[in-house]
Curated annotation (Swiss-Prot):
Keyword S-adenosyl-L-methionine: no
Localization, UniProt: Cytoplasm
InterPro entries: DTB_synth_BioD (IPR004472), P-loop_NTPase (IPR027417)
UniProt GO molecular function: ATP binding; dethiobiotin synthase activity; magnesium ion binding
Reaction catalysed by this enzyme: (7R,8S)-7,8-diammoniononanoate + CO2 + ATP = (4R,5S)-dethiobiotin + ADP + phosphate + 3 H(+)
Residues given in the record as ATP binding sites: 50, 111-114, 171-172
Organism (species): Anaeromyxobacter dehalogenans (strain 2CP-C)
Binding residues for Mg(2+): 16, 50, 111
Protein name: ATP-dependent dethiobiotin synthetase BioD
Keyword Cytoplasm: yes
Record-linked NCBIfam families: bioD
Lineage of the species this protein comes from: Bacteria, Pseudomonadati, Myxococcota, Myxococcia, Myxococcales
GO aspect biological process, one term: biotin biosynthetic process
Residues that, per the record, bind substrate: 41
Biological function: Catalyzes a mechanistically unusual reaction, the ATP-dependent insertion of CO2 between the N7 and N8 nitrogen atoms of 7,8-diaminopelargonic acid (DAPA, also called 7,8-diammoniononanoate) to form a ureido ring.
């Protein structure tokens, strides 16, 4: 399977917008890429869900249930959200859905929920999913204070499991003036021996931000 697994150091770090930007950039370059969200939970009514955003970035070529096999109401990790509804997530079903997309498209960008060790099923985490898919992992991290620890821990967890790392992207998700931002990339590189691929700038205009992310990521990430 060709593609990427997009994980985060936390929830709310911008995984979905990075995954969407990657899909759009790949498609603009002529690569038939499609996004996938194995499980989503806690969708806010009146706003597009992560899966809907990925479907739109993918050109709307797949039905929503192919993009996202599991949807839950409660804003919880997938395993907990499934339990709350008397349901269970199957890793095998998610892998089968990803392989089905890979059979129809040249590349699949899979966006996890939360961070790497967030429980996906009653027994497996998103790290187990990344391993089962065999995709290199792109780590999306916040750019500001606290990211050094979160990013180093995520990289360590990936390395301990022998999972390939496609890179680290630091993402500014707001206009806050944080004096740690210019320093964090170098500190992460020192601790992990991995230079972050990009520091994505903050842009309040959603359309311009999407274009900016796409251009930066297209130049840095190949899959």
């Amino acid at each position: 399977m060709r593609g990427l697994f997009v994980t985060g150091t936390d929830t709310g770090v911008g995984k979905t917008e990075v995954a969407c930007a990657l899909v759009r950039a790949a498609r603009a370059a002529g690569l038939d890429a499609v996004g996938m969200k194995p499980a989503q939970s806690g969708h806010v009514a009146g706003e597009p869900s992560d899966a809907e955003r990925l479907r739109e970035a993918s050109g709307g070529v797949e039905p929503l249930e192919a993009i996202c096999p599991y949807t839950f109401a409660a804003p919880l990790a997938p395993a907990a959200a499934a339990r709350a509804e008397g349901r269970e997530v199957s890793l095998a079903r998610v892998v089968e859905a990803a392989r089905a997309l890979a059979a129809r498209h040249a590349a699949v960008v899979v966006e996890g929920a939360g961070g790497l060790l967030v429980p996906l099923t009653a027994r497996e985490t998103h790290a187990d999913l990344a391993a089962a898919l065999g995709l290199p992992v792109l780590v999306v991290a916040r750019a500001g204070l606290g990211t050094v620890n979160h990013t180093a821990l995520t990289v360590e967890a990936l390395e301990r499991r022998g999972l390939p790392i496609a890179g680290i992207v630091l993402n500014r998700t707001g206009p806050e003036d944080d004096p740690s931002v210019p320093l964090n990339a170098a500190e992460i590189a020192r601790l992990t021996h991995r230079e972050p691929l990009a520091l994505l700038p903050w842009e309040p205009d959603i359309a311009r931000r999407a274009r900016a992310l796409g251009s930066v990521l297209a130049a840095k990430i190949q899959f």
